[in-house]
């Protein structure tokens, strides 16, 4: 994992550098700590808490231009929002899933995949790998635990890992959303609709 060489990553508001995964992880926790992040109403996702740290760290790694960074962020937002809508917001939430976490890795994989120049097959694999690591439960509400900040942070690492592993040749499941055995739409929602991914 070449990106974990201890340089290239910057934790916002700090001195020095670390690896891009650690920087993106901590930056995502910081972004979600005060609960002031954005929301996409139709998917109930907070895209920026994971997307910006992931894309920013990856952009630094590949020395991307500002335009390339913004293009990647747009790709990530489009992905996280569409996956969130496809999962069926109300049913997904009633089953205890946190859409920022379950969908965030997809957005991060798309953004980082764009910055890494993944081809179509590699990007499909990256999305599949991000989906197979999807998680995030609302159980923290029961006792007021502070672990909710881990949700966008893990989404960042899952998306980064997925994009870099796809670039290195690892494959992910093409039908991660709609697979009969283990597809996320059936596992995470009673009202999942694959058509919303492309509408």
Where are these regions (language model features)?
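N-terminal core-entry segment
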Residues: 1-198
């Amino acid at each position: 994992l070449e990106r974990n060489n201890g340089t290239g990553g910057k934790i916002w508001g700090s001195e020095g550098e670390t690896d891009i995964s650690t920087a993106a992880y901590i930056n995502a926790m910081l972004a979600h700590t005060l609960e002031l992040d954005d929301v996409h109403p139709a998917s109930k996702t907070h895209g920026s808490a994971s997307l910006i740290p992931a894309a920013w760290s990856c952009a630094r790694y590949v020395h991307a231009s500002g335009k390339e960074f913004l293009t990647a962020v747009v790709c990530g937002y489009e992905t996280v929002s569409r996956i969130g809508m496809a999962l069926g917001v109300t049913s997904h939430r009633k089953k205890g899933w946190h859409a920022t976490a379950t969908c965030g890795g997809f957005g991060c994989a798309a953004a980082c995949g764009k910055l890494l120049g993944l081809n179509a097959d590699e990007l499909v694999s990256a999305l599949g790998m991000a989906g197979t690591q999807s998680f995030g439960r609302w159980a923290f509400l029961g006792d007021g635990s502070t672990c909710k900040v881990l949700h966008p942070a893990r989404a960042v690492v899952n998306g980064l890992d997925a994009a870099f592993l796809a670039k290195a040749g690892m494959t992910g499941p093409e039908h991660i959303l709609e697979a009969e055995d283990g597809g996320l739409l059936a596992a995470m929602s009673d009202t999942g609709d694959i058509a919303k991914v492309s509408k």
